[in-house]
Each structure stands twice: as C-alpha cells, then as structure tokens.
Amino acid sequence: NETEVDSDVTIPTPISGQLMNLSQVNDQTFSSGSVGQGFAIKPSDGKILAPFDATVRQVFTTRHAVGLVGDNGVVLLIHIGLGTVKLKGTGFVSYVEQGQRVKKGQELIEFWDPTIKKAGLDDTVIVVITNSDKFSDFDMMMKAGQNVQAEDNVLELKAKNEEESAIGGGQVEPAN
C-alpha cells in the first residue's frame, strides 16, 4: 500500500551536531544519492529523536539504524555511522521496535560515540528519504557546516504532481 505524501514537508534533524551535505559522506552508497536524497550530521551527542510522527518500519538487530514511515508520507532511514554494523549493537540502545508508533521528539536510539571512534569508525549520522522518487525538490534550509540542534528543520521537500511522478526523483538544492 502506497503512503500518501503531503504536498510540502520539512524534515528536522533527528540529532544535534554539524550539518553536512550527503555528498560529503565518506561512503559511495549514501553520497551518490542511490539510497535516497537527504543530509548527514556530525553528531555532538548520541540521541536520535523521531523527526516527525511515524511508525517504525524497521529496527536493525545491530541497532545502528532505524527506518520510519512518517504520517507525512516520508519513508526515512536514519543510519548511525559508517561500518557500524561491525559493532554488532555494542554501544547502541534501541528504545523502539518494529511496528511501534512514535511521536515527534521521542527518543528512538541512543549510541555511545566513543565506542564508534574507538573502533576506528566514522560516526556520521546519515538521514535519507528512501522514497525520494515521490518528491520533485529537495531544498536545504541551512548551510552545510552549520551547527544544528535536534528538531531544527533542515530539509524541505516538495511532493511531485502526477506528471512529474512519471519522470523520477529530483536533486538536493544547496541553501544559498
């Protein structure tokens, strides 16, 4: 069943830290946009909050990532760090399970940053819209390099109209 997409959606950051463009992420899979459009955060704490009211679609057994389906129609993947699947859940606590309803601002996952760093891994938190093809425009509302607090709005999405839906996904426009 297809999620109904709201016409315009703003995506807040689920974590505090320094805003990065997805293209700056040190992983082709994410930086190329093939998983979806979005943004990344160099975290300043270890709390991942729900960016909007949603249903938890998936919690990875290793707790380093969570998938949400928002009431706004956005399907979101929040991925903590690069290569962190190797940690097998060490340093990560999940507060939610698959199918659970969550409210905006509710804590989803907590992670201990030193565990990631000690393992020599990148702690960048990646936020991607996996149903990016439903949207025509992705506009960053803040510049990369800015410090953001959890729940600050950072990305604006515009839903496609019917004709555009046939064409494919748009690209992220940088903030000017």
Region spans (language model):
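Contiguous, well-folded functional domains in the mature portion of proteins
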Residues: 1-176
